[in-house]
Amino acid sequence: LTLAAACMASFTFAQDAPLWMRHCAISPDGTTIAFTYKGDIYTVPVGGGRAMQLTTNPAHDTEPVWSPDSKRIAFASDRMGSMDVYIVSKEGGEPRRLTTHSGSETPVAFSDAGHILFSADIMPSAETVLFPSNGQFRQVYKVSVEGGRPVLYSPMPMERISINKEGTILYQDKKGYEDYWRKHQVSPIARDIWMYAPDEKPAYRQLTAFGGEDREPVWAPDGKSFY
């Protein structure tokens, strides 16, 4: 009886205080948080309340990304063997597969209401890369929310992308193989923040030059300053 009571208490705690809810993403309208829990995508109001499960596939669903109108969510899933990009309504329903490459593809942002940027390592030949990446130096591609053939958006790594309403991109670069979680790193290959504005010249502009790590930029609501 004591063991049974302990097991029941442990189960109750796991349900009331779940752990390892990851990859949180706040909707652009500021009302809802999408997150990953036990390999599925959930949403919950920012003020708290009951979470709604959006995906129920036995595969691993992760990395939710909101559309600009806060009505759809793109995510990565390995339900067909490797990570592909899927899209689903925030109300639930059957997700639609958008990419089909045998490599790993992960959504990073909506470039606009009709297109999703995703990271992948699928360059076709050695002539297209600067040095061997071992999957670490991923390119950025763009695909329509209706599906179709993806197009190359950036041959260089653009990590932790944040896009404002004008379409200007903030991202962190990647210069080497250094461990992402190495403490107190100060080196020439530490990450820096860059801005990419397609309609400006120069289109790329380095915003930080600290010897340590500068990373994970996020636009402020005004679209002019960032964290």
Residue ranges and their predicted role:
Residues 18-26:
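Extended, small-residue-rich solenoid/repeat segments and analogous flexible loops
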